[in-house]
Amino acid sequence: MAKGKDKSGRLSVFKGHEARLNKAIFHTLALKGPQPVYALLKEIGKQRGFADTRYGVVRRRVEALEKQDYLMRVGVVKTHVGSYTPVYQLTPRAELALALSKTNLDSFIKKADYAQIIKMLETLKPC
C-alpha cells in the first residue's frame, strides 16, 4: 500500500484539530435550532470534554464555519447588556455533511437495491 494521505471518506469539516468542536456545533444547532454563540457555548459546555471551552474559541469557530458556508446568520437577538448578537443556523451544506458523516457508504453499497444505487450515481455525477 502506498504511503501518503489517507483517502478516507471523512469530510474535511470533520478532520483536523477543530473537528470535535465542529461536530459539537453542528449537533447542537441541529437539535436546538438557530442560536446565538453564547447559547451555543452553554449547550456545548454541557457535553463531555467541552466544559472548559471558552466563548472566543466557539465564536471564532462559528465565524470560520460561516465563511465556509456551513452556517448562516438568520437574525439578531438583544443581549442582557443591551447590545445585539447574531443568531446562527445550519445551512443545507452542513445538514448534508451531518447526514453523510452518519452514513456508512460501505453498508449502503451492500444493502441498496439497483434503483437506489442508480439514483445515487445520478446525484453524484459531475455536471
Give the ranges of each region predicted by the language model.
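Short, cationic-aromatic polyanion-contact patches
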Residues: 18, 76-100
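Short acidic, hydrophobic short linear motifs in intrinsically disordered regions
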Residues: 35-45
